[in-house]
Design a protein with these regions (language model features):
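Well-ordered alpha-helical scaffold segments within catalytic/enzyme domains
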Residues: 71-85, 133-146, 207-222, 301-320, ...
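Extended ligand-binding clefts on enzyme/binding-domain cores
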Residues: 128, 164-168, 172-175, 237-304, ...
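C-terminal capping/lid segments that line or modulate ligand- or cofactor-binding pockets
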Residues: 187-193, 198-200, 364-384, 422-502
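Acidic/His metal-coordination segments adjacent to aromatic residues that form catalytic metal sites
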Residues: 111-118, 179-199, 261-295, 359-360, ...
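Bacterial N-terminal signal peptides
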Residues: 12-21
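Aromatic-rich carbohydrate-recognition surfaces in CAZymes
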Residues: 124-152, 156-263, 477-491
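Extended, well-ordered alpha-helical scaffold segments
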Residues: 91, 146-162, 222-241, 310, ...
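Low-complexity, Ser/Thr/Pro/Gly-enriched N-terminal "stalk/linker" regions
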Residues: 31-129, 154
Length: 502
């Protein structure tokens, strides 16, 4: 049935709503192995009545949501009451709760402790990066909802347990799942049954620190910083130091039999050479693509800020002055190396940050949409938004001088080799809005996000610059929740009138 042809007919409108109700009510939690049928068909549940569009929520039925939060529902009601643009209200209501609605698995362990698995969406595994970003916007509500606080606590503890298991892994399987998908067990690395994938990415160890620190700052709950926390921190420090490559290549290698060049590493799994200069090597980017030069600059900035947060916790909560000092010394070393090796004197933009370097003098001048990115440095708080080098870098990455910036008839933004040419990631558009100090620029970004959802009411991994109906990943919870985070931040920053002018 094509709902675009429904006009002023109560019978047909009622029938459409009945079909929707049946579709929602007949789903169960296993339905979320594929949410395409209820959530992603363009315009499937956008009805028109007297030439006015009626937007029907694309959230799953209450009984089918994987996790319920009174605080999140209250925040949705609070925000939607303030927004006058019906389509923007609809998109916010769809996107902001997508993580808890469709990806959170909360468990209570035998000892009564909290344990939360946060799937990335259409892939049934928990990335340390994605999970830390997916639940991040809910932390501000933790004191208003005990169930939400326990879910967040369980996420952090699960991240600590994962780091204890293997600090080099980026994604983990659900130990409560009786039939996990061991898709990458044939990878030539130290794979374990508990792992989904073992790509070494610096940010995998940073996102848990960022989340734990913010949870502690908001709630004051220090109960998460016990034995598992200390073991995880030991692994984080040991891994960061090993990947400074001062004592050789280190223990980590990775190879995969694949047709994708960036899904494996050169030089027998060790990657391209680096010169030990104090920076931390990252075999892969936050896109899960192999680095060209292993000193990945945005991730090294992220490591500095994360280590400083960890040092504060260790000093204040654990009274572990030695480990806190170890974090601070390492952060100082990496920060000094960044100032020495990460800056490029660009003939057009002046001093900018390179995306990757190798310590030998080689620099890669690009940006990739995935966060941490050069554009997202200010969003993560790794640099001041008014830092002149950051502003120069921001101008560079949002231009056609960045090889992975694409501009078309549908939109513009940064992509990356993970999806390829001409594919813009909405995440980059959101990062431009997050880091903007210009109302016209922010408004332009929001309008572009609204215009490139292919009529689905959700964010996607990427869309074609000339045709948003050509998109990848129909169910990518991180980008959905990030959109909700952006709208809330803009309202908190006094930008409601801007949003209501769209």
């Amino acid at each position: 049935m094509n709902y675009n042809f429904l006009r002023n007919t109560f019978i047909f409108t009622s029938l459409a709503l009945s079909v929707l109700l049946f579709a929602f009510c007949s789903t169960g939690t296993k339905r979320f192995k594929d949410q395409t049928d209820y959530a992603q068909k363009a315009n499937a549940i956008v009805l028109e009545n007297d030439n006015a569009k009626v937007y029907v929520s694309k959230r799953p039925a209450v009984a089918d949501r994987l996790f319920a939060s009174v605080a999140v529902d209250s925040k949705i009601a609070e925000i939607t009451k303030q927004l006058t643009n019906a389509r923007l209200r609809w998109m916010f209501e769809n996107c902001y709760p997508n993580t808890i609605d469709t990806t959170v698995r909360y468990y209570t362990l035998e000892d009564g402790d909290d344990d939360t698995l946060v799937y990335t969406g259409d892939i049934h595994a928990m990335w340390l990066r994605d999970s830390g970003a997916q639940v991040w916007p809910y932390v501000q509500l933790a004191n208003e909802d005990e169930a939400l606080r326990k879910m967040l606590r369980g996420t952090i503890l699960r991240q600590f347990r994962s780091i204890i298991l293997d600090p080099y892994a980026n994604a983990f399987l659900d130990p409560h799942d009786p039939n996990p998908d061991h898709q990458w067990m044939s990878d030539r690395t130290d794979m374990k049954l508990e792992l989904h994938e073992r790509k070494w990415e610096i940010d995998s160890l940073c996102y848990p620190l960022r989340l734990a620190y913010e949870y502690w700052r908001v709630t004051g709950d220090a109960s998460i910083f016990q034995e598992e926390w200390l073991k995880a921190m030991h692994n984080i420090l040991a891994t960061f130091k090993e990947q400074q490559k001062k004592d050789g290549h280190g223990s980590y290698v990775f190879q995969r039999k694949t047709e994708r060049q960036l899904d494996t590493m050169s030089n027998d799994g060790k990657g391209n050479p680096v010169k030990p200069v104090g920076l931390i090597a990252s075999a892969f980017r936050p896109s899960d693509d192999a680095t060209t030069f292993q000193f990945l600059i945005p991730s090294n900035f992220f490591a500095v800020s994360s280590l400083r947060k960890a040092a504060e916790i260790l000093q204040t909560v654990n009274q572990d002055a030695d480990m806190a000092q170890e974090c601070t010394v390492l952060a100082d070393e990496v920060e000094n190396a960044l100032q020495q090796y990460a800056i490029n004197n660009h003939p057009k933009y002046g001093k900018i940050y390179a995306y990757e370097v190798d310590g030998f003098g080689n620099q890669l001048l690009i940006d990739d949409a995935n966060v941490p990115s050069l554009l997202a440095l200010a969003y993560l708080g790794d640099v001041d938004v008014n830092d002149p080098i950051y502003q120069n870098t921001r101008n560079f990455v949002w231009s056609e001088d960045n090889p992975y910036f694409f501009r078309g008839t549908a939109g513009e933004g940064i992509g990356g080799p993970h999806i390829g040419y001409d594919m813009v990631w909405p995440m980059s558009i959101m990062m431009k809005a997050f880091t903007s100090q210009n109302d016209d620029e922010i408004k332009y970004c929001i309008k572009m996000l609204m215009a490139t959802d292919a009529g689905t009411g959700f964010m996607h991994e990427s869309f074609h610059k000339d045709n948003p109906h050509r998109f990848t990943r129909h169910w990518f919870a991180w980008q959905n929740t990030l959109f909700g985070e952006l709208i809330i931040k803009l309202i908190d920053d006094g930008k409601l009138d801007l949003l209501n002018s769209i």
